[in-house]
């Protein structure tokens, strides 16, 4: 009898401690960190694609929260949000990256997310594909409606892609964030509205005569870009609208020297010209 009583006394503090921890730490958070990378409400998903697949197609706004970092290693890992789905992707300070790959024919080539629906990205996360030298085109390929509230988005300099690519008929709104690393930070063929952000480009035609770009490009006869504020820095050039409509209300546009070839390759900080169709600038 004494032995049993003594055991109970020893176990009592343990059970009290466990109960205290369980009360402080939500059950869903524990499971999310151990067995999944994304969460909708209390439901945990093993992949971001599984979470996107669970979102209703009737336009209901659904928050998907990342609970762990994600590393993609092959093309099948690229995530697609289908038309009709409305997602707020809370990066929750996490990251989505490409696995390191320096081969000329990488196992993974593209951007981490293809958006055909309505996607809002928030939560100050990182989307970085720069580890794949020739396959890390950038972060987001937008065919739908994309809103970026904050975060850091990086592509691979030599992959000949854009960190954010806004396709024809797509709509893009950027409130803030850092966009850099890729051949081009923002390539717009649709409608893009920029309220703030930092856009950096380091490509240089003297370093590579076939892979270089202005940092921001407005590049379609039907493209429309409304730029209210932000900082655009480029080695080859900062902002280019060679087609479509560009309205610039403020911001800083700057060219910087190539660390190898100096200022020789630099084009214009701000370039507006009708290379394709008729260009309007206001």
Predicted regions and their residues:
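Acidic Gly/Asp/Thr-rich repetitive segments characteristic of extracellular carbohydrate-active
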Residues: 34-67
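Sec-dependent signal peptide cleavage junction
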Residues: 24-37
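A general structural motif
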Residues: 59-63, 84-86, 222, 276
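Extracellular beta-strand-rich solenoid/capping regions of secreted or surface-exposed proteins
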Residues: 72-88, 97-122, 130-146, 164-168, ...
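Generic short beta-strand segments
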Residues: 67-73, 93
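Bacterial N-terminal signal peptides that target proteins for export
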Residues: 4-15
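Hydrophobic core
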Residues: 16-24
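Beta-strand-rich solenoid/repeat architectures in extracellular/passenger domains
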Residues: 93-108, 120-136, 149-161, 175-183, ...
